[in-house]
């Protein structure tokens, strides 16, 4: 008899399956470093990944903030330690514009801190990325999405991943702009 959690709107209930496993109902939970919520979406996950990246950045600030260290070395350390934490598990996210802006905004703040530059200096974020020899966080996410898409495409057609990818949900959509699908994120 297993015990687990499932994210649903009705918090506090227990769901019991036929085999006797019990699932506690919660509004959100962390699974493999990714936040899953009852409402869906990736806003909570992107916030958590950003906080984790800032924690990692703060751990390395004594080195990344030094003036005597070359920018290329800072860029390599940032890319391997901080940026990798920020984009962990993001290849499956279907992000909204606000989520993308949150990640970019936080990355730009870290880059300015590393380079010792303020917004008053009027140096673009692209220029800072060039100085540090790093890709932007959204380009890294796009590359990892394409890599993951390749894995999914090579799966056998009767695999559950392929079935989920081809799944079409019946019913009527709510009002407003439709949610962006993961496939639409890959195609852009």
What are these regions (language model features)?
Residues 1-188:
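Short linear motifs embedded in intrinsically disordered, charge-biased segments
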């Amino acid at each position: 008899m297993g015990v687990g959690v499932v994210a649903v709107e009705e918090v506090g209930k227990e769901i019991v399956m036929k085999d006797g496993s019990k699932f506690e109902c919660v509004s959100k939970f962390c699974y493999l470093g990714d936040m899953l919520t009852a409402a869906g979406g990736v806003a909570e996950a992107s916030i958590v990944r950003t906080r984790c990246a800032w924690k990692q950045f703060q751990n390395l600030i004594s080195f990344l903030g030094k003036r005597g260290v070359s920018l290329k070395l800072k860029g390599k350390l940032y890319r391997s330690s901080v940026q990798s934490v920020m984009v962990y598990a993001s290849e499956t996210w279907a992000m909204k514009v606000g989520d993308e802006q949150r990640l970019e905004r936080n990355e730009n703040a870290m880059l300015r801190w590393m380079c010792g530059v303020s917004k008053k200096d009027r140096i673009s974020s692209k220029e800072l990325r060039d100085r540090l020899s790093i890709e932007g966080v959204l380009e890294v996410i796009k590359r990892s999405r394409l890599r993951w898409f390749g894995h999914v495409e090579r799966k056998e057609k009767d695999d559950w991943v392929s079935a989920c990818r081809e799944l079409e949900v019946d019913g009527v959509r709510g009002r407003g702009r439709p949610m962006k699908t993961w496939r639409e994120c890959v195609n852009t």
